[in-house]
Amino acid sequence: MKALLVLGFLLLSASVQAKIYERCQFARTLKRNGMSGYYGVSLADWVCLAQHESNYNTQARNYNPGDQSTDYGIFQINSRYWCNDGKTPRAKNACGIPCSALLQDDITQAIQCAKRVVRDPQGIRAWVAWQRHCKNRDLSGYIRNCGV
């Protein structure tokens, strides 16, 4: 009986653990999904952005008390404008997805939503971390030795 309880606990804890991408694995995933040069944004820019937003963590969440919104997932996409979490007042849901979709290990939906964000007039500047850590910097190290 104890063995079953331990096994059940291990399975439950494994199911809620985040996938944390390795830098090159993330770069290759982005490239396979058409992010290299998408709307003029380099692969290195995307990798830099994700490192500073979530440290490549698919389960990253950050609550913003000022507007009661939350940033979700590897790209830290905000519930005020881009997804629906059922909690954010006056949310727009421009990506047309539940915010929980941005927390999946399979980041296909997160990538599609990030593409939607970057098509907005603000473009990549919508991400504060990109402006603070990536803009006008040599980002070659973010994709070095990744084979992309």
Swiss-Prot record:
Tissue: Expressed in lung, small intestine and spleen.
Record-listed E.C. numbers: 3.2.1.17
Residue ranges of the TM segments: none
Disulfide bonds: 24-146, 48-134, 83-99, 95-113
An individual GO BP term: killing of cells of another organism
Domain C-type lysozyme intervals: 19-148
GO cellular component: endoplasmic reticulum lumen; extracellular space; Golgi cis cisterna; Golgi stack; microvillus; rough endoplasmic reticulum lumen; secretory granule; trans-Golgi network transport vesicle
Subcellular location, record wording: Secreted
Reactions the enzyme catalyzes: Hydrolysis of (1->4)-beta-linkages between N-acetylmuramic acid and N-acetyl-D-glucosamine residues in a peptidoglycan and between N-acetyl-D-glucosamine residues in chitodextrins
Single GO term (MF): hydrolase activity, acting on glycosyl bonds
UniProt keyword list: Antimicrobial, Bacteriolytic enzyme, Disulfide bond, Glycosidase, Hydrolase, Milk protein, Secreted, Signal
CDD domains recorded: LYZ_C
Catalytic residues in the record: 53, 71
Signal peptide: 1-18
Organism superkingdom: Eukaryota
InterPro entries: Glyco_hydro_22 (IPR001916), Glyco_hydro_22_CS (IPR019799), Glyco_hydro_22_lys (IPR000974), Lysozyme-like_dom_sf (IPR023346)
PANTHER family with a match to the protein in the record: LYSOZYME C
Role this protein plays: Lysozymes have primarily a bacteriolytic function; those in tissues and body fluids are associated with the monocyte-macrophage system and enhance the activity of immunoagents. In the intestine they may also have a digestive function.
Subunit description: Monomer.
Misc: Lysozyme C is capable of both hydrolysis and transglycosylation; it also shows a slight esterase activity. It acts rapidly on both peptide-substituted and unsubstituted peptidoglycan, and slowly on chitin oligosaccharides. Rat has two lysozymes, type 1 and type 2 of which only type 1 is expressed; type 2 being probably a pseudogene.
Protein name in UniProt: Lysozyme C-1
